[in-house]
């Protein structure tokens, strides 16, 4: 979520430092200083450490001593540097007299790649030292980001190498190299693969130096991608073979490439091209009159940010476009700005305001409630979210409001305060914000809103306003009362439900409304205290070694143990290339109570006895009498850091050799169990996360059988030498694999939780197997001769939006729950949704929900509009509930009450609280609601409709005056430009559609509208903003803390103008004839066609343990009639430098002024699910053509280091000679759409789906082929300098 904010909060001096000063600063930071680090964890006290800047890698590092680096941050990730004690890390020690540093001696570094930034809070020894660090780091931040790509690669290579070569010996082992390449997403099949390539580099044995590593990297990158169809590559490769350094791209050749292929008009000037090449290479030895690229450097340029598909000229703010009324702009807007996570238990933070403002957000929300001492607090009312002071928020806004943008900021006030506290709010607005607060109109006689230029550096208040002449009065609110809004709940919080399998209690979020109790799926109980550190249980020191991978126990009797140890070490070190010092520890066969250390040195196994003795009843361990340890674990840890010394050698213990058969004693392992037997066992445990591991018949092969989403699934595990493989993830052992997936999801959200064996089945297994977990409704007969089982009726969840094409179909949105589903053949099912019963919908748009366990009587009738939204697990009707406190508690929980229902016999739900007070309050409120449900609902509606407003606060409202939306006023004299309306997304959807979209756009041409997420989005997810934008809504408020597609689209919309927060809507939208949903209403706008080939990628991020198998989805998002997506094939096991086969993708865009081109890189996992890796989204109007790099971002829209796609992109006008060609993109796509529609609508209610619809499918395929041929022919005819929006200057 990169913005354009200055890194230093309060400025960084009068000007840029001179070259001499920069040199002095860099030398000083490289030497480092001793400073005190204040931690974010309460359990850690401040410590003095040495802080240094590593210029070779552009990192800040810290350590206690000179040897071991304890931590590091990349300078490229630093977002802001603040002088003073401006973080909560200092606040934790205010009461400790030992840690009260001088304000002028402190500074804070904020860094990270997510919305919520991390802090490095430091105390220096003097104010001069603080200034040195701030000034030096500020220069380094800018210089690091602006460095040319080859220099960034050099720094990245050194960072990777030094992460292994921590002692800076300039050498690493082949095993280290193999592991390093795996970490950067490159599959090394075996050690021989590396040896062959290292031989090419004249490295025949021993360790690898940095120079050899760097050369290997360049060789791997070029050899993998030289097959791409690129200019110069084919002919040059024939001449140079595998040696790219034997062939060059000269200055004239590069100039011609820029002109002919890239359409770069600036390249007509050879001097500019020369300067560009020199600045890219930045090599003193290459500063010659005619610079050149080696072939691998040319390919590197194609993937570089310097060759971006985005036209960087659009990054600059154009003041001439800032003179329209505010209502003509899209304005970057945040919802519940103060939150850092979900809507019910996350932290409210001042940093969230600072982050949003520095990202260019221009409309932020303040949710104000009565607080102590007469001053409001800000939080999400009636939830567990933490509270922050209103006055602190104002100071934060003042400090950060105009750092990223000088254009106006709108404060959207959600006011729940009393009159007295409203008056205090008004006073503080004026006191803190001063002259920046707008208190009077810019022009008294204006007939429209002022422009961004007229409101520069002004802050506007959005709040309800009194009628003229009132001191205070009750005014109607524009919000309809809804008991499904969590802010209107009577009580909510964390309670606990017992797991029926392991009888542990897990937290769930409960909400009590005026008529129902809602509760969520399992959640975290401490989201609001993310800085708290859970104390770890420490085993007895004498047993610490038992779980270490290097401890092998008793390997055999007599000399067998010695021989087994030698075999294990020899096989492991030869196969993996493990270094000297690789070791294992085993019980001694000769001396009871002693152990043997076996290690690898110079190609042989050596053994050393570890002695033990009792000292005052406590065991002690030692190799030599003069150095004794309290435990075997301490001894081994010591010699991993300090060398073993003897007359012949000195050597540290390096790599532990893992146990090979440790899994055989585990409760989840079954040596002789068939697939059918495993399934039968799991059918008796109807809980997700139940699992077992079984040996398969194939050599070195295992299977994990588990339950997820109500179904039994299997995945194969393969032993390959010393490595255990699950998909493309590598583990040292089967035990390590299971341990990893007990902490991380194995399949979607499912973690391995309940190990299953016969003993476990006796305790928790059901008497009757759950056959529904194994057999789908489409194949109900699990015995061939049995009568068919009745069709299952289940619930499904929508994966995508779907709009009905016929009267007998359902319309639903993504995540909708469709009930009472009947699975039919032919790809179409029936179900109930939105009040419609048993209508058709496509089965591939949904996924089946987990079979509901018989805990919740209303689970099959879940309320789709509940306050918990997608987090909902169950709902209870309060008037039907009976509450009973269990004085004795239950299963180690003291504070338990039961909920039962008279209508459901023999059913109750046991719920636990954290305290007696909490239990009593819940029981009291539930009983009250049960008695007064109807009256409370009526009272709530009445109270919410009337609100008192203080005059002092009302007077601060000038332009943003919220009023109830009145459709009848649109286009009449009663419409006032100062009035605006707010809509939850559900209400907005009633206007942003074909029926009313044009009318709503007319409203937005004069007045502001604000749209915000519905209250049920407790997970802080976002809605699709595109329909709101195209209908003219200016303030489309999103949860900035959530890294989802809507926020990525938001970042793309506002990327022009340096994220200034204001984007002028296209002039088309101000045309009275324009209809957002009718492409025939477009006037004066030329449609375009885009052809894209995805050629390759570099430096894709990892997702978990394995090497990724990436594919790319290309999407055009914009007007409803333009939106479409296509995808490439996936590449197996390569995220470092994958290449895709040549395949053009074609897109037709009718409204390019409101269109985005979006690339998303996914990986396909072993379950054929797609997992997000990276994305890049651009407005179509700013795209360049030719062979272009697509710099990739993470899900928070932060730049990924060196990650990019290489594409070939051409953009054509869709019309030729003024008329549409019979084989133009438009006509072919419409013909294809017709054929697709026939295929889609003509589904079989009976009979064969395949036979009846073969012909429409064939017509669709032929149309698509014609479209591809059309693009190819146009590409051959079109000049190479095709461009969009003028000059494609870099």
Swiss-Prot record:
<dbReference type="GO" id="GO:0001726">
    <property type="term" value="C:ruffle"/>
</dbReference>
<dbReference type="GO" id="GO:0005168">
    <property type="term" value="F:neurotrophin TRKA receptor binding"/>
</dbReference>
<dbReference type="GO" id="GO:0005737">
    <property type="term" value="C:cytoplasm"/>
</dbReference>
<dbReference type="InterPro" id="IPR035023">
    <property type="entry name" value="PLC-gamma_C-SH2"/>
</dbReference>
<keyword id="KW-0945">Host-virus interaction</keyword>
<feature type="domain" description="SH3">
    <location>
        <begin position="791"/>
        <end position="851"/>
    </location>
</feature>
<dbReference type="GO" id="GO:0048015">
    <property type="term" value="P:phosphatidylinositol-mediated signaling"/>
</dbReference>
<feature type="modified residue" description="Phosphoserine">
    <location>
        <position position="1248"/>
    </location>
</feature>
<dbReference type="InterPro" id="IPR000909">
    <property type="entry name" value="PLipase_C_PInositol-sp_X_dom"/>
</dbReference>
<dbReference type="GO" id="GO:1905564">
    <property type="term" value="P:positive regulation of vascular endothelial cell proliferation"/>
</dbReference>
<dbReference type="Pfam" id="PF00017">
    <property type="entry name" value="SH2"/>
</dbReference>
<dbReference type="GO" id="GO:0016477">
    <property type="term" value="P:cell migration"/>
</dbReference>
<dbReference type="InterPro" id="IPR000008">
    <property type="entry name" value="C2_dom"/>
</dbReference>
<dbReference type="GO" id="GO:0005509">
    <property type="term" value="F:calcium ion binding"/>
</dbReference>
<dbReference type="InterPro" id="IPR001452">
    <property type="entry name" value="SH3_domain"/>
</dbReference>
<dbReference type="InterPro" id="IPR035892">
    <property type="entry name" value="C2_domain_sf"/>
</dbReference>
<dbReference type="InterPro" id="IPR000980">
    <property type="entry name" value="SH2"/>
</dbReference>
<feature type="modified residue" description="N-acetylalanine">
    <location>
        <position position="2"/>
    </location>
</feature>
<feature type="modified residue" description="Phosphotyrosine">
    <location>
        <position position="1253"/>
    </location>
</feature>
<keyword id="KW-0225">Disease variant</keyword>
<keyword id="KW-0007">Acetylation</keyword>
<dbReference type="InterPro" id="IPR001849">
    <property type="entry name" value="PH_domain"/>
</dbReference>
<feature type="active site">
    <location>
        <position position="335"/>
    </location>
</feature>
<dbReference type="GO" id="GO:0009395">
    <property type="term" value="P:phospholipid catabolic process"/>
</dbReference>
<dbReference type="GO" id="GO:0002862">
    <property type="term" value="P:negative regulation of inflammatory response to antigenic stimulus"/>
</dbReference>
<dbReference type="InterPro" id="IPR002048">
    <property type="entry name" value="EF_hand_dom"/>
</dbReference>
<dbReference type="Pfam" id="PF00018">
    <property type="entry name" value="SH3_1"/>
</dbReference>
<feature type="binding site">
    <location>
        <position position="176"/>
    </location>
    <ligand>
        <name>Ca(2+)</name>
    </ligand>
</feature>
<keyword id="KW-0442">Lipid degradation</keyword>
<dbReference type="GO" id="GO:0050429">
    <property type="term" value="F:calcium-dependent phospholipase C activity"/>
</dbReference>
<keyword id="KW-0727">SH2 domain</keyword>
<feature type="modified residue" description="Phosphotyrosine">
    <location>
        <position position="775"/>
    </location>
</feature>
<protein>
    <recommendedName>
        <fullName>1-phosphatidylinositol 4,5-bisphosphate phosphodiesterase gamma-1</fullName>
        <ecNumber>3.1.4.11</ecNumber>
    </recommendedName>
</protein>
<feature type="region of interest" description="Disordered">
    <location>
        <begin position="1271"/>
        <end position="1290"/>
    </location>
</feature>
<feature type="domain" description="PH 2; first part">
    <location>
        <begin position="489"/>
        <end position="523"/>
    </location>
</feature>
<dbReference type="GO" id="GO:0005085">
    <property type="term" value="F:guanyl-nucleotide exchange factor activity"/>
</dbReference>
<dbReference type="Pfam" id="PF00169">
    <property type="entry name" value="PH"/>
</dbReference>
<feature type="domain" description="C2">
    <location>
        <begin position="1071"/>
        <end position="1194"/>
    </location>
</feature>
<dbReference type="GO" id="GO:0045766">
    <property type="term" value="P:positive regulation of angiogenesis"/>
</dbReference>
<feature type="domain" description="PI-PLC Y-box">
    <location>
        <begin position="953"/>
        <end position="1070"/>
    </location>
</feature>
<dbReference type="GO" id="GO:0042995">
    <property type="term" value="C:cell projection"/>
</dbReference>
<dbReference type="InterPro" id="IPR016279">
    <property type="entry name" value="PLC-gamma"/>
</dbReference>
């Amino acid at each position: 979520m990169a913005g354009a904010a200055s890194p230093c909060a309060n400025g960084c001096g009068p000007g840029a430092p001179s070259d001499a000063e920069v040199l002095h600063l860099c030398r000083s930071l490289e030497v480092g200083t001793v400073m005190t680090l204040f931690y974010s964890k309460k359990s850690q006290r401040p410590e003095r450490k040495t802080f240094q800047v590593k210029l070779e890698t552009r990192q800040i590092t810290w350590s206690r001593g000179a040897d071991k680096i304890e931590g590091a941050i990349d300078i490229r990730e630093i977002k802001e540097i603040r002088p003073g004690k401006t973080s909560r890390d200092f606040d934790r020690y205010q009461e400790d007299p030992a840690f009260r540093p001088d304000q002028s001696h402190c500074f804070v570094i904020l860094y990270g790649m997510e919305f919520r930034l991390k802090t490095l809070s430091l105390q220096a020894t003097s104010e001069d030292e603080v200034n040195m660090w701030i000034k030096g780091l500020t220069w380094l931040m800018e210089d690091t980001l602006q460095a040319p790509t080859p220099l960034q690669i050099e720094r990245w290579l050194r960072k990777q190498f030094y992460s292994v070569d921590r002692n800076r010996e300039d050498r690493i082992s082949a095993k280290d190299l193999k592991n390093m390449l795996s970490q950067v997403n490159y599959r090394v099949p075996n050690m021989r693969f590396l040896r062959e390539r290292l031989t090419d580099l004249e490295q025949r044995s021993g360790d690898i130096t940095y120079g050899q590593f760097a050369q290997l990297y360049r060789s791997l990158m070029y050899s993998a991608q030289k097959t791409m169809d690129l200019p110069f590559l084919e002919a040059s490769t024939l001449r140079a073979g595998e040696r790219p350094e034997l062939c060059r791209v000269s200055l004239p050749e590069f100039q011609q490439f820029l002109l002919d292929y890239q359409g770069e008009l600036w390249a007509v000037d050879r001097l500019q091209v020369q300067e560009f090449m020199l600045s890219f290479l930045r090599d003193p030895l290459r500063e010659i009159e005619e610079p050149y690229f080696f072939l691998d450097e040319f390919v590197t340029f194609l993937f570089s940010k310097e060759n971006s598909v985005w036209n960087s000229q659009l990054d600059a703010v154009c003041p001439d476009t800032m003179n329209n009324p505010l209502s003509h702009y899209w304005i970057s807007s945040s919802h519940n700005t103060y939150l850092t996570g979900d809507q019910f238990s996350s932290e409210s933070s001042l940093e969230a305001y600072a982050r949003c403002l520095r990202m260019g957000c221009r409309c932020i929300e303040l949710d104000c409630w009565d607080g102590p001492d007469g001053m409001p607090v800000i939080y999400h009312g009636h939830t567990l979210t933490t509270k922050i002071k209103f006055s602190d928020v104002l100071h934060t806004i003042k400090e950060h409001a105009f750092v990223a943008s000088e254009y106006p900021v709108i404060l959207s006030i959600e006011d729940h305060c009393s009159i007295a506290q409203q008056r205090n709010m008004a006073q503080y607005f004026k006191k803190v914000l001063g002259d920046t607060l707008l208190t009077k109109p810019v022009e008294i006689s204006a007939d429209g809103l002022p422009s961004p230029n007229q409101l520069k550096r002004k802050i506007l208040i959005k709040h309800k306003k009194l009628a003229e002449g009132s001191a205070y009065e009750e005014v109607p609110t524009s919000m309809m009362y809804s008991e499904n809004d969590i802010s209107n709940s009577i009580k909510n919080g964390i309670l606990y439900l017992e797991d029926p399998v392991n009888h542990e209690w897990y937290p769930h979020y409960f909400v009590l409304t005026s008529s129902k109790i809602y509760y969520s799926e399992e959640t975290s109980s401490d989201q609001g205290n993310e800085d708290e550190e859970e104390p770890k249980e420490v085993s007895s020191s004498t047993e610490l070694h038992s779980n270490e991978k290097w401890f092998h126990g008793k390997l055999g009797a007599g000399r067998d143990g010695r021989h087994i140890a030698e075999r294990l070490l020899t096989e492991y070190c030869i196969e993996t290339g493990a270094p000297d010092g690789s070791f294992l520890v085993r019980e001694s066969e000769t001396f009871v109570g002693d152990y043997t250390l076996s290690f690898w040195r110079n190609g042989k196994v050596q053994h050393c006895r570890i002695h033990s003795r009792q000292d005052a009843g406590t065991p002690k361990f030692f190799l030599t009498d003069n150095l004794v340890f309290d435990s075997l674990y301490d001894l081994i840890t010591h010699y991993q850091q300090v060398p073993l010394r003897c007359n012949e050698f000195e050597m540290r213990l390096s790599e532990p050799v893992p146990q090979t058969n440790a899994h055989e004693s585990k409760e989840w392992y079954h040596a002789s169990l068939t697939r059918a037997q495993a399934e039968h066992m799991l059918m008796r445990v109807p809980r997700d996360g139940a699992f077992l591991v079984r040996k398969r018949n194939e050599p070195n092969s295992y299977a994990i059988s588990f339950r997820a989403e109500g179904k039994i699934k299997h995945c194969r595990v393969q032993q390959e030498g010393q490595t255990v493989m699950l998909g493309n993830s590598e583990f040292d052992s089967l035990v390590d694999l299971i341990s990893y997936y007990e902490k991380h999801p194995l399949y979607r959200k499912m973690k391995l939780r309940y190990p299953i064996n016969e003993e476990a089945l006796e305790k928790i297994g059901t008497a009757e197997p759950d056959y529904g977990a194994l057999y789908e409704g489409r194949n109900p007969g699990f015995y061939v001769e049995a009568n068919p089982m009745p069709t299952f009726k289940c619930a499904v969840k929508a994966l995508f939006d779907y709009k009905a094409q016929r009267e007998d179909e359902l319309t639903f949105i993504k995540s909708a729950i469709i009930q009472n589903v009947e699975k039919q053949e032919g790809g179409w099912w029936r179900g109930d949704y939105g009040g419609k019963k048993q209508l058709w919908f496509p089965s591939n748009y949904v996924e089946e929900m987990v079979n509901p366990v018989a805990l919740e009587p209303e689970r099959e009738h879940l309320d789709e509009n509940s306050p918990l939204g997608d987090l909902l697990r169950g709902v209870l009707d309060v008037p039907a509930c009976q509450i009973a406190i269990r004085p004795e508690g239950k299963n180690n929980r003291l504070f338990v009450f039961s909920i039962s229902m008279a209508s459901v016999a023999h059913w109750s739900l046991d719920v636990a609280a954290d305290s007696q007070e909490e239990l009593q309050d819940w029981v009291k409120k539930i009983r009250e609601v049960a008695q007064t449900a109807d009256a409370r609902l009526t009272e709530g509606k009445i109270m919410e409709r009337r609100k008192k407003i203080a005059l002092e606060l009302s007077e601060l409202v000038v332009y943003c005056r919220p009023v109830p939306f009145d459709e009848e006023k649109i286009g009449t004299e009663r419409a006032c430009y100062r009035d605006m309306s707010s809509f939850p997304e559900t209400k907005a959807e009633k206007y942003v559609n074909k029926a009313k979209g044009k009318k709503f756009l007319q409203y937005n041409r004069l007045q502001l509208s604000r749209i915000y997420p519905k209250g049920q989005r407790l997970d802080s997810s976002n809605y699709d903003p595109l329909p709101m934008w195209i209908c003219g809504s200016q303030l489309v408020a999103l949860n900035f803390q959530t890294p989802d597609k809507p926020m990525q689209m938001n970042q793309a919309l506002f990327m022009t103008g340096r994220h200034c927060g204001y984007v002028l809507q296209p002039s088309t939208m101000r045309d009275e004839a324009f209809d957002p949903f009718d492409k025939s209403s477009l006037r004066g706008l030329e449609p375009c066609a885009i052809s894209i080939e995805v050629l390759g990628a570099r430096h894709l991020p990892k997702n978990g343990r394995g090497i990724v198998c990436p594919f790319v989805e290309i999407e055009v998002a914009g007007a409803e009639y333009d939106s479409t997506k296509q995808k490439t094939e996936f590449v197996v096991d390569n995220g470092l430098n994958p290449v895709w086969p040549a395949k053009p993708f074609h897109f037709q865009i009718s409204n390019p002024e409101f269109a985005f081109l979006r690339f998303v890189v996914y990986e396909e996992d072993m379950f054929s699910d797609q997992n997000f890796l990276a994305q890049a989204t651009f407005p179509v109007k700013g795209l360049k053509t030719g062979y272009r790099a697509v710099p990739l971002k993470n899900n928070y829209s932060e730049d990924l280091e060196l990650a990019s796609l290489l594409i070939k992109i051409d953009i054509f006008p869709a019309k030729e000679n003024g008329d549409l060609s019979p084989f133009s993109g438009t006509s072919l796509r419409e013909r294809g759409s017709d054929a697709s529609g026939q295929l889609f609508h003509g589904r079989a209610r009976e009979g064969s789906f395949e036979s009846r619809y073969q012909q429409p499918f064939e017509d669709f395929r032929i149309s698509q082929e014609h479209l591809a041929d059309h693009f190819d022919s146009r590409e051959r005819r079109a000049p190479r300098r095709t461009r969009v929006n003028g000059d494609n200057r870099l």
